[in-house]
Amino acid sequence: GSLITAMRTGAVAALSIQYLRTSSAREYAFMGLGNTARATLLCLMAVLEGPLNIRLLSYKGQELEFMKRFKEYSRLNFSIFENVEDLITGADVVVSCVTVAHGQFASDTCFKSGVLVVPVHTRGFQNCDLFFDQIFADDVAHVEGFKYFNQFKQFDEFARILLKQNPGRTSDQERILAYNIG
């Protein structure tokens, strides 16, 4: 994809994070560390203040290139994780920009109370569809074909939060999934 597509997608993901994270979110996990993840972090820094703890999934040296790209930003603190379950466990926000997934990324128990998961390319989080408290997407048409769509506990389009027609997160205990497909 183009840089414009990556930036647009990153901006939408950052907006979802800004509106749906818990009030105390500090740990941001990233997997799939290409242009979309980089754009998401750039946009996130524009809308969030203070230091950010950024967890990166180790994969083919991409985590080192990612950290190198952001080395001049002193408010970013990086840590590297060797496997997905460790990356997700304890994270307040999980951003996935991976383009290929074979099965689920992590068991249900890895997703702590209050977590926000933003699977930009939708893959690998099907188990979350069944137990997360709220699920948002840019457009119902993007997700209505999902295997478990009819079993979502609570679903709405993200735009309704921006229009103040849906409060979004109503407690810091809710697990929320935000599908940003574009």
What is the meaning of each model-derived region?
Residues 1-17:
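A glycine-rich, Thr/Ser-enriched phosphate-binding loop motif common to dinucleotide/cofactor-binding enzymes
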Residues 13, 21-44, 58-61:
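Glycine-rich adenosine-cofactor-binding loop
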Residues 20-27, 49-50, 112:
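Short helix-loop-beta connector
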Residues 29, 53-55, 79:
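A structural signal for isolated positions on well-ordered beta-strands in alpha/beta enzyme cores
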Residues 47-71:
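NAD(P)-binding Rossmann-fold cofactor-contacting core
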Residues 76-150:
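Rossmann-like adenosine-cofactor binding region
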Residues 129-182:
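Adenosine-phosphate binding glycine-rich loop
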